From Swiss-Prot:
Its EC number is 2.7.11.1. Keywords: ATP-binding, Autophagy, Cytoplasm, Kinase, Membrane, Nucleotide-binding, Protein transport, Serine/threonine-protein kinase, Transferase, Transport. The active site is at D168. CDD domains: STKc_ATG1_ULK_like (cd14009). It catalyses: L-seryl-[protein] + ATP = O-phospho-L-seryl-[protein] + ADP + H(+); L-threonyl-[protein] + ATP = O-phospho-L-threonyl-[protein] + ADP + H(+). GO terms for cellular component: Atg1/ULK1 kinase complex; autophagosome; cytosol; phagophore assembly site membrane. This is Serine/threonine-protein kinase ATG1. Residues 360-419 are annotated as: Disordered. Homodimer. Forms a ternary complex with ATG13 and ATG17. It comes from the Eukaryota. GO terms for biological process: autophagosome assembly; autophagy of mitochondrion; piecemeal microautophagy of the nucleus; protein transport; regulation of autophagy; response to starvation; reticulophagy. ATP binds at I27, G28, K29, G30, S31, F32, A33, V34, V35, K50. It is a peripheral membrane protein.
Amino acid sequence: MSSESHDKVVAKAIRLPTENYSVEKEIGKGSFAVVYKGLSLRDGRNIAIKAVSRSKLKNKKLLENLEVEIAILKKIKHPHIVGLIDCERTSSDFYLIMEYCALGDLTFFIKKRKNLVLKHPLIKTVFEHYPPPSTEHNGLNRVLVVNYLQQLSSALKFLRSKNLVHRDIKPQNLLLCTPLLDYNDPKTFHELGFVGIYNLPILKIADFGFARFLPNTSLAETLCGSPLYMAPEILNYQKYNAKADLWSVGTVLYEMCCGRPPFKASNHLELFQKIKKANDEITVPSNCYIEPKLFNLIRGLLTFDPDSRMGFTDFFNNEVVTEDLTRYEQSYEPDLESKSKDVAESNMFVSEYLVKPLKQQESAHIPPTQTDENTSVQTGVRRTSGKERLATNHPPHQQIHPEDNSQNPEQSYQSASQKRLKSSYNDLILEKEYVVVEKKTVEVNSLADDFANNGPITNNQGAQVIKPLRYRTSSSSDASGGRRASLVERRLSISSLSPSNALSKALGLASVRLFGYQHNTKATSSPPQQTLLNPQIFQELTENAVLRADHKLNPFSEQMLDSNITPAVESLAAKAFVMYSFAEMKFSQILPTPPSSTDYDPLSDKRLSNGSCAIEDEEDLDQGRPPSNQTLTSATTKISSATNVDTQIPAPELKKLCTESLLLYLKALTILAASMKLTSKWWYENESKNCTLKLNILVQWIRDRFNECLDKAEFLRLKLHAINTSPNSQWSDDDPVIFVEKLIYDRALDISRNAARMEMESGNYNTCELAYATSLWMLEILLDENFQFNEVYDDEYASNITSLDESDKEMIKKYISSIANRLKALKSKMV
């Protein structure tokens, strides 16, 4: 579909309650809102329309944030704050009619400048007049830095007078408008209340979704905002006041000077530790110079202790903030006003001036050495044919050459180094991952808390509600037998086992963990453990999988009645557990292990690298206890250990394992997020707010797995970063591209083939049944569009991640049908 056709579709799809505004095209998208460019039919001015769907605001806190934003914007009017023109509501959506800022946000000037100056006439003129200080970083000219600092200061001073704290100051929330529209000289510019230089793009603060009224004596405890720009007291979950905004101003000021944030990390805990360890010493890249008085201002704002941090009075009176810029207004660009008006009147948003990605037919002629393979590794998906993606013997060899607008600000856009291209994209992905914590973790935990705090619940038999099920790391037997070895420390060499027996043990363990199955185990006096699901549920799930394969059962409908929400969540929990277990198997190979370990992957009939822990020892399986869960102390409280690359595994193999594990955990996160999204919809449409014991336990389990998967994904990013930045790191254009779909596809077929062999050789029907079901669930995961990565990552990068093409889907459907027939035949033998 062409861009023009798409715009027409959008215009038809979005209908505002009144006829005062028309919608033209989408220009931005966030977690909860889509922003469109529109037109005011009353005066012909361009506007921005922020559309927020009520269905996305299931969490009460999210709805409150929107109401706060509307209330604040209605009360405040300031030339350096994006104004709210109107607000309209329908039964399904909120529409905020706002000022239109045609130049996007400050990140376009910092990260996309080198691309925009080639195409955008106004931006080209600005940077010709105020060139950047260096080609080695993305910092801005000092005049631009001070100009935008003063405009930001003006807006904050106004907010301060209203006892408002923004709480989410960052470059993405600092929008830029075209100058010289309502004025054409410095005098009128300043009479209208603007500060700074009259013929430069104008900065305005936007997005008050996290803002709140906070008097001088008040403290808040809410975790909000974007971690890269968060004050350390917020990162550490401490009470904070309006000074938190000053820290954020310091990070923005530093980024305007150096082209990157002052501190970077892959989770908020590590970020806090880095800030604390710096001990108020702010370092500047060797290729960047900041004048002393500007640097002293940055240091004053980026002071760890909020009590010692520069206050608002000192900030507003700082010599840089109050510097006279009128000498820069003497110069006059004769065509600047016409260029500015042309941009404002055009139908193009700033992002449309960026170089577009090459078409697929063009990319087919690009040699592999010119493509950024790490893009595919990070997302796990690439636009390839079905044969390329799923063929077991022929790796993919063509890919689209993506637009590289997302490089790390420290690096040159014109670098020819493949290593730096890959590293830069990876850095940006790590930065974007912060949004996951903000967007999904808060929602998942909030919903689980709502369930847990719903009061005593009884099941159908009247049993009192128990605590949410969690796997334990120790048991009562530990006291008598000494400390029980952790999963990392215990290893079992099963090379002597046949594939069938090994598969039986591994799948038997999985069945104990999830369904409560326990075959051929020793008698034990240990009390039975409550399992997440039970054998009867397993039978229902497998029967439903067969019926779906035979097209006799439709997927769960959207009618969220109490009678069918639990089965739907059970089905998703089973699929999430399958993906989580696959990721765990890969993850266990990455952690340091005894050199003598020789392990074996029973589900694929292949020997694994040292460090494998494909199955647990027989003690867990025989006693029927949930196995000890792997601890992530080194990943959460000792982050530094994650940067030590395991020397037992060669770097290329370790990198491959880390990438595979990361992709599998991300896929597990998408399934867990989808299950919570389904549950959230039912919960907030359920007026009684009552749930069964079973559903409550499911929700708590999903919450635990979500948090665990997120922690391990962050650990793996640190590991990959350590590998990529190691002095011995070697990049090769021949490095294989890893697709999460192919990992799942190959694994599903391996399990199915081994199960078929076991069925013929050993007759262990129960284990075979579980194996076939596991294979079916894995293949179903590939076909379910709700499990795509953008379920977790609601940002511009999700658009690069595509679903399988039709040939892929047809191939998978054939295997599903075949495996379902085997499972059906097996069940007839078991009757």
